[in-house]
C-alpha cells in the first residue's frame, strides 16, 4: 500500500477547503523512499549534490548570475504529441518569431523548427533543431537554449545527442493517448543522461482528453512520482484556461494568439477539485522531499514558496516531475510552462558534468562552468550547411571566442574557430564569444560527433552519447552515373548520423546502407534525390541477423603452411562458449601458462577473433554473445608469426562454432499500434498473422493501443497492411527489443540461401 493512499482518509469540507492534516503515527511507520524511489539512487544524488556545491564555491558572482539566468532545455515526446507546435508557441510568446505557423506547412510556411522541406511535407521532425530565446519573469530576463527533437523512433539518435548536452527537458504528453511507446523510450533516454523534466500534458482541447489518466500513467508506466500543479478550466472544446494549484489562481489566455495572460479568482465549481489536487501535490512531495516530509509530520501547511522550493529540489533530484497542462494549438497554458522552466529546471551550475583527464590515467574531473577556467566543449552534432560543415558545440567550461585555436583531444589536431554562431533553426546569428553553459555552432572544424575540444592547456575527454545498433539494411545503387555525388551524400550522412551506416559488399558488389528502420532509410534516399540530384534504386529491406552458439565446444587447431623458405605455423587450444550476460557482448580471453604463446601472438589471436566475429560461419552475419578462451598452444621457432596465429584463431573459431549447436538470432521488435476502437479486431488479426505475441491492450475513449513483440522479418510492408485494415486511421511504432533464435525452418532456409550464393561465386 502506498503512503499516499494511506493518507487519503475521508475529510470534512471546511469553507470549501480541505484542511491540511494527517495521521503522523501511520506515516512515520513506513519508509517513504521505498514507495517512490528516485530513478537515480538517493545516495548517488546526495553525493552528486555535495560535488555540485563544491563546484559552486569556485564560481565568481558574475558566473553565478550568468548561470542563474540560463536554461538548456529540450522538448521531447512521442510522435504527434505536439512538440513542434508547442515549441512554435514558445518562440512566439518569447518574441523570437513574429507569427505562428503550423506543422505540415499548411500555411505554405511551416513550423519554424521544421526547416527541411521533408519535415514540413510529412509533418514530422527529422533532425533536432536548436534555437534560443529570452523570457521575462518577475522583472528578470532568462535565456533559453532550446532543442526540439524528433518523436519517431527511427530518429532516436537525435534525441540521444540532444539530451547528452541538455540540463533539463519538457516532456510533452498527449492528453488523449497518455504515455505511449516513444514516451517510455524518451523517459529511458532522460534517465540515461540524468536529465530532470517538467511534464506538459498537451491537446487538452481534444475530445477524450483526460489529464489525470495521463498523470496516473506517468506514475505507473514511467515509475516517476508525478503530480499536477494545475487543473483545467473547462474540458475538450470548452477549455478556457488553467488553475494554478500552488497560488490558487485561475489563468486565462487572451488576445488573438493567447499572448495576453489574465489572472483571476478560481471558479467556485472548481475549488473542491483544486483543494483535492493541491493536497495530493503536497502528499506526493512529502513522499520524495525531506523538508516537505518534516512539515507533513508536524502537520504544518506549507507556504506557496515552500511548495515551489520542494518542487525544484525534487525535480532537480530527478525524483519527481511537476505536471502542467494546456493546448499548444489552442494557445492555452504555454506561458506557465516557461515560468516552470525557470522555477523548477536546473541552471548549468546545478548540474554535475564530468570529464576524464587523458593526461592523468583518465582520472575523473568535475567541470566548473566558469569563464576563467580552461575551455572544454563537446561537439554533439554535425550538419552540412551552405558554408561547409556546421559543428554544434556545448561549452561546459571556460569560454569559446571567435579566432581562438582549440584542440581536438581525440586527434590532437589544433583548429581555428573562424566563425561562431547561435542557431535559430536554419538561421544563424554571428557572435564573438560564448560562455560556459551555452550552446553554439562553428564552421570549418573537421571532427566527429562526440569529440571533445579544449584550449590545449588540459587534456579532458567527455563521454559520448549512446548509439544503438542498426536493425534494417538495404542495397542501394545510383541510377545515374554520378558516383561522385552519391559518395559525397553517403559520407555526409554518415558523419551527421552515427546510426546511419554504409558498407560495400565485395561479394554482391553492392553498397549496403543500414539504419534504425524503413522510414529512417527512406528519408536518406529521398534526401539524396533532393539535395544531391541522385536517383537511387533500392533493394528489398534486409534484416540484420546475428549468429550465436548454445553449448561450449573445445578446439585444438594447428595452422601449417610450407611454400619454400619460412612457412607459417600456429597452434591454439581452448574453448568456445556462449556468454550468459548479454550486456557483455563478445569476449576474448587468454590463460596461457609458461609463455607457450608469446604476447605479440596472443594480440594477433585477439585481432583474428574480432575479425571472424564480423562475419559468422553460418550466413555471414555478425556473431553475438560468444566467448573464446585460448589456454594453450604451440609455436615454431622459425615459422611462427602474427599472421599464423591470427589465421589459426579464425579457423579454430569457425570449426568450433559449427560444433557448438549454432543458432541464427533475429531482431525482435516492440510494436505499438494505435487505432480507432472499431478496428481492434482487424489489428489483432493482422498481428496474429505475423505471429506476434500480444503483451498488452489499452482501450481509451475512442481509440485503443495494442503492444506486442514481433520478429522484424515479418514487419516489412506492415504500414501498408495496417492502412488497409484501419482505413488509413491506424498508426504504429517499432523499437528494437532484443535478439532471439529464429525458428528451425527459417534458420534452415537462411543457411541454404547463403550456401547457394556462395556456390555461384
Swiss-Prot record:
Gene3D superfamilies linked to this entry: 3.30.230.10, 3.30.70.240, Elongation Factor G (Translational Gtpase), domain 3 (3.30.70.870), P-loop containing nucleotide triphosphate hydrolases (3.40.50.300), Translation factors (2.40.30.10)
Domain of life: Eukaryota
Pfam family, one: GTP_EFTU_D2
SMART domains per record: EFG_C, EFG_IV
Chief location of this protein within or outside the cell: mitochondrion
Post-translational modification summary for this protein: The precursor is processed in two steps involving mitochondrial intermediate peptidase (MIP) and mitochondrial processing peptidase (MPP).
GO biological process, one term: mitochondrial translational elongation
Domain tr-type G span(s) in chain numbering: 68-349
Assigned GO CC terms: mitochondrion
Location(s), subcellular: Mitochondrion
Pathway info: Protein biosynthesis; polypeptide chain elongation
Alphabetized GO MF terms: GTP binding; GTPase activity; translation elongation factor activity
S-S pairs: none
Annotated residues for binding of GTP: 77-84, 148-152, 202-205
Keyword Cell membrane tagged: no
PROSITE patterns: G_TR_1, G_TR_2
SUPFAM superfamilies: EF-G C-terminal domain-like (SSF54980), P-loop containing nucleoside triphosphate hydrolases (SSF52540), Ribosomal protein S5 domain 2-like (SSF54211), Translation proteins (SSF50447)
Family affiliation: Belongs to the TRAFAC class translation factor GTPase superfamily. Classic translation factor GTPase family. EF-G/EF-2 subfamily.
Biological role: Mitochondrial GTPase that catalyzes the GTP-dependent ribosomal translocation step during translation elongation. During this step, the ribosome changes from the pre-translocational (PRE) to the post-translocational (POST) state as the newly formed A-site-bound peptidyl-tRNA and P-site-bound deacylated tRNA move to the P and E sites, respectively. Catalyzes the coordinated movement of the two tRNA molecules, the mRNA and conformational changes in the ribosome.
Annotated protein name in UniProt: Elongation factor G, mitochondrial
Organism: Saccharomyces cerevisiae (strain YJM789)
Amino acid at each position: 500500500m502506498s503512503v499516499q493512499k494511506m493518507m487519503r482518509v475521508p475529510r470534512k469540507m471546511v469553507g470549501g477547503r480541505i484542511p491540511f492534516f494527517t495521521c503522523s503515527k501511520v506515516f512515520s511507520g513506513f519508509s517513504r523512499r521505498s514507495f517512490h524511489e528516485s530513478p537515480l539512487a538517493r545516495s548517488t544524488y546526495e553525493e552528486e549534490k555535495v560535488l555540485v556545491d563544491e563546484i559552486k564555491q569556485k564560481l565568481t558572482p558574475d558566473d553565478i548570475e550568468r548561470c542563474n539566468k540560463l536554461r538548456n532545455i529540450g522538448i521531447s515526446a512521442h510522435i504527434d504529441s505536439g512538440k513542434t507546435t508547442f515549441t512554435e508557441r514558445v518562440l512566439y510568446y518569447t518574441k523570437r518569431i513574429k507569427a505562428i505557423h503550423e506543422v505540415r506547412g499548411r500555411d505554405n510556411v511551416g513550423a519554424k523548427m521544421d526547416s527541411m522541406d521533408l519535415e514540413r511535407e510529412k509533418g514530422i521532425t527529422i533532425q533536432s533543431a536548436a534555437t534560443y530565446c529570452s523570457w521575462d519573469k518577475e522583472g528578470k530576463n532568462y535565456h533559453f537554449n532550446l532543442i526540439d527533437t524528433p518523436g519517431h523512433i527511427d530518429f532516436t539518435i537525435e534525441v540521444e545527442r540532444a539530451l547528452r548536452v541538455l540540463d533539463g527537458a519538457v516532456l510533452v504528453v498527449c492528453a488523449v493517448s497518455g504515455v505511449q511507446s516513444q514516451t517510455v523510450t524518451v523517459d529511458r533516454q532522460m534517465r540515461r543522461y540524468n536529465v530532470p523534466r517538467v511534464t506538459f500534458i498537451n491537446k487538452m482541447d481534444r475530445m477524450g482528453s483526460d489529464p489525470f489518466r495521463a498523470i496516473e500513467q506517468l506514475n505507473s508506466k514511467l515509475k516517476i512520482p508525478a503530480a499536477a500543479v494545475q487543473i483545467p478550466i473547462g474540458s475538450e472544446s470548452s477549455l478556457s484556461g488553467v488553475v494554478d494549484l500552488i497560488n490558487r489562481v485561475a489563468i486565462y489566455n487572451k488576445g488573438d494568439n493567447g499572448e495576453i495572460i489574465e489572472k483571476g479568482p478560481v471558479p467556485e465549481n472548481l475549488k473542491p477539485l483544486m483543494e483535492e489536487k493541491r493536497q495530493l501535490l503536497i502528499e506526493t512531495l512529502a513522499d520524495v522531499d525531506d523538508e516537505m516530509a518534516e512539515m507533513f509530520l508536524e502537520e504544518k501547511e506549507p507556504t506557496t514558496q515552500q511548495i515551489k522550493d520542494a518542487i525544484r529540489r525534487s525535480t532537480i533530484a530527478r525524483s519527481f516531475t511537476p505536471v502542467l497542462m494546456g493546448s499548444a494549438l489552442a494557445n492555452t497554458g504555454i506561458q506557465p510552462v516557461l515560468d516552470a522552466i525557470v522555477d523548477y529546471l536546473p541552471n548549468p551550475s546545478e548540474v554535475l558534468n564530468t570529464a576524464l583527464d587523458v593526461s592523468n590515467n583518465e582520472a575523473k574531473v568535475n567541470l566548473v562552468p566558469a569563464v576563467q577556467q580552461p575551455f572544454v566543449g563537446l561537439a554533439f552534432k554535425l550538419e552540412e550547411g551552405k558554408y561547409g560543415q556546421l559543428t554544434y558545440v556545448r561549452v561546459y567550461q571556460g569560454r569559446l571566442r571567435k579566432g581562438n585555436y582549440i584542440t581536438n583531444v581525440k586527434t590532437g589536431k589544433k583548429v581555428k574557430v573562424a566563425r561562431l554562431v547561435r542557431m535559430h533553426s536554419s538561421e544563424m546569428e554571428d557572435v564573438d564569444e560564448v560562455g560556459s553553459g551555452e550552446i553554439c555552432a562553428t564552421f570549418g572544424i573537421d571532427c566527429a560527433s562526440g569529440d571533445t575540444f579544449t584550449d590545449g592547456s588540459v587534456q579532458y575527454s567527455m563521454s559520448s552519447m549512446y548509439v544503438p545498433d542498426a536493425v534494417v539494411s538495404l542495397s542501394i545503387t545510383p541510377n545515374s552515373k554520378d558516383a561522385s555525388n552519391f559518395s559525397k551524400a553517403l559520407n555526409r550522412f554518415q558523419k551527421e548520423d552515427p546510426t546511419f551506416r554504409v558498407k560495400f559488399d565485395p561479394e554482391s558488389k553492392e553498397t549496403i546502407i543500414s539504419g534504425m528502420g524503413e522510414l529512417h532509410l527512406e528519408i536518406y534516399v529521398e534526401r539524396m534525390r533532393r539535395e544531391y540530384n541522385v536517383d537511387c534504386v533500392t533493394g528489398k529491406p534486409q534484416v540484420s541477423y546475428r549468429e550465436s552458439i548454445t553449448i561450449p565446444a573445445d578446439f585444438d587447431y594447428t595452422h601449417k603452411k610450407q611454400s619454400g623458405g619460412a612457412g607459417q605455423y600456429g597452434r591454439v587450444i581452448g574453448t568456445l562458449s556462449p556468454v550468459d550476460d548479454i550486456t557483455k557482448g563478445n569476449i576474448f580471453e587468454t590463460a596461457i601458462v609458461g609463455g607457450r604463446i608469446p604476447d605479440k601472438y596472443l594480440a594477433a589471436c585477439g585481432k583474428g577473433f574480432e575479425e571472424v566475429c564480423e562475419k559468422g560461419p553460418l550466413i555471414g552475419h555478425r556473431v553475438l554473445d560468444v566467448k573464446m578462451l585460448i589456454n594453450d598452444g604451440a609455436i615454431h621457432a622459425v615459422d611462427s608469426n602474427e599472421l599464423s596465429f591470427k589465421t589459426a584463431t579464425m579457423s579454430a573459431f569457425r570449426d568450433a562454432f559449427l560444433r557448438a549447436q549454432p543458432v541464427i538470432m533475429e531482431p525482435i521488435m516492440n510494436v505499438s499500434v494505435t487505432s480507432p476502437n472499431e478496428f481492434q479486431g482487424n489489428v489483432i488479426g493482422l498481428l496474429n498473422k505475423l505471429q506476434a505475441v500480444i503483451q498488452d491492450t489499452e482501450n481509451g475513449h475512442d481509440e485503443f493501443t495494442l503492444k506486442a513483440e514481433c520478429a522484424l522479418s515479418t514487419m516489412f510492408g506492415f504500414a501498408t497492411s495496417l492502412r488497409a485494415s484501419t482505413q488509413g486511421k491506424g498508426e504504429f511504432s517499432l523499437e528494437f527489443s532484443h535478439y532471439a533464435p529464429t525458428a528451425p525452418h527459417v534458420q534452415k532456409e537462411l543457411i541454404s540461401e547463403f550456401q547457394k550464393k556462395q556456390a555461384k561465386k
